[in-house]
Design a protein with these regions (language model features):
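Structured alpha/beta or helical-core interaction and ligand-binding surfaces enriched in interleaved
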Residues: 1-143, 151-154
Length: 154
């Protein structure tokens, strides 16, 4: 336990460890080309601190495009051409980040760009540069029996 951990953070950490951590790690391992273990995740305190400093919103939206979910080559081409720095250090965020913690990754090359629709249950994957200069949101969904992917860069 971190000395600065609040009761609410401790509750989330313990609840997340029991209820979400195994599935969270499984999702991360499907989405990345590296093996992810629980000790690689940021603490709840550090995760909260990092996320509190993020101020991306519709006013800071730099780029948005909707593509077919299956077109992973186009996804990678767009992201490579629009992001400031593909090789920067990023934080990866999935649905249960508040209970399990952010995952620091060395760059976007470790991401499995050929991921499957069911690899992330909520349909949202977020990458935030560790220097907080940029955020990439991959939001995928099904509509009228077709699968789409929204790419948003802030």
């Amino acid at each position: 336990m971190n000395n600065n951990e609040t009761y609410e953070q401790k509750r989330r950490r313990l609840f997340g460890k029991v209820n979400f951590l195994p599935a969270y790690l499984q999702q991360l391992n499907k989405l990345l080309n590296i093996e992810v273990t629980a000790d690689m995740l940021l603490s709840i305190v550090k995760t909260d601190s990092f996320l509190e400093q993020i101020d991306f919103d519709s006013d800071t939206l730099f780029y948005k495009e909707t593509i077919s979910f299956e077109d992973k080559e186009k996804l990678q081409r767009i992201v490579r051409s629009k992001l400031l720095d593909w090789n920067a250090n990023y934080m990866m965020e999935l649905t249960n980040v508040k209970e399990c913690g952010l995952l620091p990754i060395p760059n976007l090359s470790v991401f499995n760009w050929d991921f499957k629709y069911e690899d992330e249950k909520s349909g949202i994957i977020v990458f935030i540069r560790q220097d907080k200069k940029e955020e990439l949101v991959l939001d995928f969904y099904e509509e009228d029996f077709q699968y789409f992917l929204d790419i948003e860069i802030y």
